[in-house]
């Protein structure tokens, strides 16, 4: 068993703080950017515009993550405290919201440049697990998104929360949604799935949503929401929606791949 008493602040210079969570965003975006340009982009037209696309992507991620959290997880509070929506430093980001932000940013950028937005979304999908991995590690350091009580040998006590030993669900997600998902997508990328725009995106949605859905059974639900319809969490409900959308993409895009 392990005791988690990590400091969420990575670096502090006088009153300026750089937190692990912020650092995870920076590292995830930079590494994703690097691998995308060095390995996964084969189209020169997309490569030449990718740096500009990153600006859209960053804005989409930040706004999407925040608005997603506000809308999906704590709408009643923010309706009565509108100014707090802008206080991102107080916490409250949603991956599913960020995913919607990325999709919208990709559509807007591709439309501006008269390109298929799936060409960009597939690249983001195959590199996203890198950012997810570091993001979940940061969640672990921050003692947030923790699991239910357990007696497994690898249980963790989050001292800033209580004295219970819990499932380190952040590490489960880092492993499955980060490392394992990256390996799966690389497997399909090597088999030419990137040649059919939308297939890699569909696979990402299916596998991410599946991993997230099952790990959520071990995770403490959001305090302000608890369990919802069919005793599922909000994260599980949204994951089902994205799973269905990913399945739709696979069916339609794979048919197009066979025709071509």
Name these PLM-found stretches.
Residues 1-260:
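A feature for loop-to-transmembrane-helix boundaries and adjacent hydrophobic helices
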